[in-house]
């Protein structure tokens, strides 16, 4: 086998469709566009979502919610992630070094997800009420 002898498999490539090139091609004259009307003309397409003047669906439906500006800045950390950390005193820097919070985050909040059996101390981190109770039940403490 040589590079100059490699060819695609039989039927793998289709010839490009040439429209408007005679009656024998099956796509001559109107080039597969039919007769008259907006879609037969060049440039004859409406914008996406246009419904012929009827109020479009995306404008008929009500707006919902909003984009939180603090979402990117706050990272959630699970309790079972804290349990896996090798240190007993956990702060934001320790979470960053462990790769538990993204680089864009400025605040971390510990949430009640999973279990923690060992005593850890949180410094400068937020915690939900349930997470706080679980940490204190394991013998740890939370210093926000």
UniProtKB/Swiss-Prot annotation:
GO terms for molecular function: rRNA binding; structural constituent of ribosome. Transmembrane segments: none annotated. GO terms for biological process: translation. PROSITE patterns: RIBOSOMAL_L15 (PS00475). The keyword Ribosomal protein applies. Residues 1-53 are annotated as: Disordered. InterPro entries: Ribosomal_uL15 (IPR030878), Ribosomal_uL15/eL18 (IPR021131), Ribosomal_uL15/eL18_sf (IPR036227), Ribosomal_uL15_bac-type (IPR005749), Ribosomal_uL15_CS (IPR001196). One of its GO terms (cellular component) is cytosolic large ribosomal subunit. Residues 21-31 have a biased composition (Gly residues). Binds to the 23S rRNA. Part of the 50S ribosomal subunit. This is Large ribosomal subunit protein uL15. It comes from Laribacter hongkongensis (strain HLHK9). The gene is rplO.
